Design a protein with these regions (language model features):
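Secretory targeting signals
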Residues: 1-4, 28-90, 109, 156
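Transmembrane helix boundary and interhelical loop/hinge segments in multi-pass membrane proteins
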Residues: 1-18, 32
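Short helix-kink/termination motifs in transmembrane helices of multi-pass secondary transporters
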Residues: 8, 40-44, 74-75, 103, ...
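Alpha-helix N-cap/start motif
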Residues: 24-25
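Terminal transmembrane helical anchor/hairpin motif
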Residues: 96-179
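Membrane-interface capping segments at transmembrane-helix boundaries
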Residues: 178-186
Length: 186
């Protein structure tokens, strides 16, 4: 995602796209659609061995959850690549986003139960900041669950809520990318 978009900026292919009589949003939506399709195909290919070992419902749920996770990260990578137009800052921010979204549950646990300084105002502020961050970041640590593959019955309603959350994040990130790309002067 990052290398392809930054290469288009560096090779001046973007000038050719912008010369066409198409809205800039079509470029972002087209790229996002392609990246989401690639995320789905990647999730299917990666999960093929699971279909022989796990229950079919659990394998399907795990595959779809992985595809949603990859779609959220691909949308954020597209946003970063379009915003920065350089590989290094976009890659660092995308990796930081993914690491934070994956590790936020651990940060919440550590801030709620500190080793020392429990009850201090610094600990309360750090816990409040981590909790506030958890409200705006996608909960990638919740999907896909390994327990689904080990015999735990998949809860389709909980998965539907996680899928809705993933689709909302993809839509929000795509909207931010379109707004940023529209305001940019080439």
């Amino acid at each position: 995602v990052l290398a392809g978009i930054t290469r288009e900026f560096d090779d001046k292919c973007m000038d050719v796209f912008l010369a066409l009589d198409l809205p800039r949003a079509h470029y972002i939506l087209g790229k996002l659609s392609g990246f989401m399709l690639a995320a789905l195909l990647t999730a299917i290919i990666v999960s093929l061995p699971l279909w022989w070992m796990a229950e079919p419902g659990a394998a399907l749920q795990w595959t779809l959850a992985l595809a949603l996770e990859l779609a959220v990260v691909a949308a954020f990578a597209l946003f970063c690549a379009a915003a920065f137009a350089q590989f290094a800052p976009a890659a660092v921010l995308t990796l930081a986003f993914y690491g934070l979204a994956r590790g936020l549950a651990g940060l919440q646990l550590m801030s709620a139960h500190p080793v020392s300084g429990a009850g201090s105002w610094q600990q309360e502020i750090s816990r409040a900041l981590v909790d506030a961050l958890a409200w705006v970041m996608p909960a990638l640590h919740r999907w896909p669950h390994t327990a689904w593959l080990a015999g735990e019955a998949p809860a389709w309603m909980a998965f539907a809520m996680d899928a809705l959350q993933g689709l909302v994040y993809v839509a929000l990130i795509a909207t931010a990318a379109m707004i940023d790309f529209h305001r940019r002067e080439f």
